[in-house]
């Protein structure tokens, strides 16, 4: 039905058009004007007319203007009728202004000009436990496994990787209530147990995949195959980097650490601009990046860079700002600046003796010392404004665990998990303590996760197979509610049964803490809008402050 009551808010009124960054199918960013706010009161259908007025569909339709002449209204009647609408407009405008002002401006080069809301965190550190940590031996104790050790599984067993399935297997590790929260933590992690009050342990994580490479891709990108951007690339793309001399996304390795199954594609920018890919730094080598130390004076290199830029800039314009060309230019300009920054970053001689001891750098355990150096450099990268940092476990070939998947104990679980925990326990706890003591934990979100968990029944005599149906991850810092448990698996630790959580939910929560609405950070490629959480994901608000 036609309604004569409509208040239009146009581009020239209090609500003006704001440029919004969108993507063409070829990946080139363009600015398009859209109304910043849609505020109106109407008793009839509303249409948006480009960047102009938002109007009632009939009141400005000349073909039906004769209908307006059939009814007349006094000014008093009109104001009385529309008073509620005017109030709604004013209130909505006030609320919108407050929400808009709560966002934070982002550095040049970020796809978003501002965060979507006030961020709780500025940086993310991803401690990836490649191979699959057993949740029932680490953060999700199951007394029933101990009581029924050696008995057949009382429920149907899903197909596993090798189908060499045994009976129920009790944990060889003891659990102790820890911290003020009293959360039980395995004897594998005595140091992490001391900081458990900083952790939000999610016991109901799930994955649809039980093979390493696919599960690794899914955990990193939200898709089971290569070719998609990793979480770190999305963070760097959307938020940019606070330090133009360093990449926005850094992957640290040390000792025998290599990329997990899936290779360096796990750190890929996918179809995002190339400068958002993960840059690998060797944390314990003289040169964190090969040939980072220049052979020529800096002034000479500057002249060369300026000379090359004379050709690059016109070519970039000829290609209509092709994303790959632009990324290549940005990459070698960043590499030039990194020549002086990276050696200083990796020089930890200025760190105190107490700091070295805290991270285990002076330990006789060379693997702990190597992983500890990654954790220390992660803190130093946070101090220098790097947006996303991923840490890599060192090789441990025990019970089928190998270079890409050292936590993969299909046999010798007690020995293999014990050795891997020895490597990472003290350094990760030290990272949390150090960040907190420096006032950095509040704006640094730490994510600890593997690609899946492990079965409550044995594989062979003393190992466990892959279990994607329910496992544990944890978050710390960055506005997370510490000292809590979220969700649960059944009493066997086989399936998530309470507050079932997905990888999409985890990354939606991380982006939320970084000030980003995961549904609104998109990139158009191949005819559709992609995002880290695909078409899924819910923010886990219960684990947030």
Residue spans for each PLM region:
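Short, low-complexity intrinsically disordered segments enriched in A/P/G/S/L with frequent Arg
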Residues: 3, 11, 18-19, 29-33, ...
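Intrinsic-disorder/low-complexity regions
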Residues: 11, 15, 25, 30, ...
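Intrinsically disordered, low-complexity regions enriched for glutamine and histidine
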Residues: 16, 22, 30-36, 45, ...
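Composition-driven detection of intrinsically disordered, low-complexity segments
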Residues: 21-23, 28-31, 36-37, 43, ...
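N-terminal secretory signal peptides
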Residues: 34, 38-74
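Ligand-binding pockets and gating/stacking loops
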Residues: 60-545
């Amino acid at each position: 039905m036609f309604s004569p009551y409509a208040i239009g808010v146009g581009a020239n009124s209090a609500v003006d058009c704001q440029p919004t960054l969108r993507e063409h199918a070829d990946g080139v960013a363009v600015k398009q004007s859209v109304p910043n706010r849609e505020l109106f009161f109407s008793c009839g259908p509303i249409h948006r007319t480009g960047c102009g007025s938002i109007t009632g569909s009939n009141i400005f339709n000349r073909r039906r203007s004769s209908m307006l002449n059939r009814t007349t209204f006094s000014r008093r009647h009109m104001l009385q009728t529309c008073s509620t609408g005017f109030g709604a407009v004013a209130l909505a405008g006030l609320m919108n202004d407050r929400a808009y002002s709560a966002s934070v401006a982002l550095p040049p080069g970020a796809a978003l000009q501002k965060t979507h809301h006030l961020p709780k965190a500025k940086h993310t550190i991803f401690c990836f436990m490649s191979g699959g940590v057993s949740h029932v031996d680490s953060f999700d104790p199951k007394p029933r496994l101990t009581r029924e050790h050696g008995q057949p599984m009382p429920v149907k067993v899903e197909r596993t990787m090798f189908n060499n399935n045994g009976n129920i297997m009790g944990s060889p590790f003891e659990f102790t209530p820890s911290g003020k929260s009293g959360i039980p933590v395995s004897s594998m992690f005595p140091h992490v147990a001391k900081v458990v009050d900083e952790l939000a342990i999610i016991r109901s994580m799930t994955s649809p995949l039980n093979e390493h490479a696919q599960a690794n891709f899914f955990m990193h990108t939200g898709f089971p195959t290569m070719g998609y951007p990793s979480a770190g690339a999305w963070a760097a793309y959307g938020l940019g980097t606070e330090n133009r001399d360093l990449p926005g996304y850094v992957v640290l390795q040390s000792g025998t650490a290599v990329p997990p199954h899936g290779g360096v594609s796990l750190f890929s920018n996918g179809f995002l601009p190339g400068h958002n890919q993960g840059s690998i730094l060797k944390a314990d080598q003289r040169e964190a990046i090969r040939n980072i130390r220049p052979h020529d004076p800096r002034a000479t290199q500057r002249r060369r860079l300026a000379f090359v830029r004379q050709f690059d800039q016109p070519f970039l314009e000829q290609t209509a700002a092709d994303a790959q060309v632009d990324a290549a230019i940005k990459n070698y300009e960043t590499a030039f600046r990194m020549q002086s920054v990276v050696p200083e970053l990796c020089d930890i001689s200025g760190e105190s003796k107490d700091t070295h001891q805290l991270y285990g750098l002076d330990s006789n355990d060379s693997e702990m010392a190597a992983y500890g150096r990654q954790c220390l450099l992660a803190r130093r990268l946070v101090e220098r404004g790097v947006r996303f940092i991923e840490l890599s476990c060192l090789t441990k070939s025990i019970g089928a665990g190998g270079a890409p998947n050292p936590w993969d104990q299909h046999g010798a679980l007690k020995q293999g998990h014990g050795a891997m925990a020895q490597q990472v326990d003290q350094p990760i706890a030290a990272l949390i303590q150090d960040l907190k003591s420096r006032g950095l934990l509040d704006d640094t979100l730490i994510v600890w996760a593997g690609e899946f968990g492990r079965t409550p029944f044995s594989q062979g005599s003393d190992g466990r197979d892959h279990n994607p149906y329910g496992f544990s991850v944890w978050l710390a810092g960055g506005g997370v509610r510490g000292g809590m448990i979220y969700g649960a698996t059944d009493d066997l630790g086989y399936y998530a049964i309470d507050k079932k959580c997905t990888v999409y939910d985890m990354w939606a929560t991380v982006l939320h803490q970084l000030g980003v609405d995961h549904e609104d950070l998109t990139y158009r490629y191949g005819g559709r809008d992609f995002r880290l959480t695909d078409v899924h994901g819910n923010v886990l608000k219960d684990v947030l402050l």
